[in-house]
């Protein structure tokens, strides 16, 4: 089974109320909504990356070998061979980092970014070096439901189903969604980093 309904799932119980995060300290947190990710980022003095920032980091250190990332291995969806030892998430050091030292920018879990989703975001951005993304969401498939962007693909991605592990691939989901293959990473601006260093030194 690759989709299954579970009750009382949350970040402490990612696969249902009988599950736990024991032994998963070095795995990405999952079952977090976009709102959860933003709340944690703000608490930590960081932020979610913009879509442009995320893609820049992914492209700078692009991983082109699909065996160097945690994606579905086998015939999707009937057989997940798990030949790398992971049927779901992997610890962050299970695969080598990309060329700029970032782990799991492809595969493992989808990652929330700050931006609203629109299918024509890049056309709207023109030639901006660091576009901030659209001011509102529009998904022509579900125009009444606001969506945020997720990037990077997950352990459910496979060339037969989802090629979201490509650095340019985009997906979207409603910001109140939490699911077992979506997490997030935080970024720091130079200003945020300066505040962090001052806190450590004082």
Residue ranges and their predicted role:
Residues 1-167, 171, 175, 180, ...:
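Functional-site microenvironments in short loops/helix caps that host divalent-cation chemistry
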Residues 180-195:
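Short, structured beta-strand segments at or near domain termini in extracellular proteins/domains
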């Amino acid at each position: 089974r690759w989709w299954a309904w579970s009750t009382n799932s949350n970040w402490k119980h990612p696969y249902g109320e009988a599950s736990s995060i024991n032994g998963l300290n070095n795995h990405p947190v999952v079952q977090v909504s976009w709102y959860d990710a933003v709340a944690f980022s703000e608490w930590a003095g960081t932020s979610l990356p913009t879509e442009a920032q995320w893609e820049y980091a992914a492209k700078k250190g692009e991983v082109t070998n699909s065996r160097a990332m945690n994606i579905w291995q086998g015939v999707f969806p009937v057989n997940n061979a798990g030949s790398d030892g992971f049927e779901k998430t992997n610890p962050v050091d299970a695969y080598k980092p990309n060329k700029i030292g970032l782990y799991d920018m492809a595969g493992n879990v989808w990652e929330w970014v700050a931006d609203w989703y629109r299918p024509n975001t890049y056309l709207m951005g023109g030639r901006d070096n660091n576009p901030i993304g659209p001011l509102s969401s529009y998904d022509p498939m579900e125009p009444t439901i606001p969506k945020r962007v997720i990037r990077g693909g997950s352990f459910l991605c496979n060339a037969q189903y989802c090629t979201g592990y490509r650095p340019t691939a985009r997906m979207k989901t409603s910001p109140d969604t939490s699911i077992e293959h979506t997490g997030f990473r935080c970024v720091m601006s130079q200003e945020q980093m300066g505040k962090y260093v001052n806190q450590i030194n004082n």
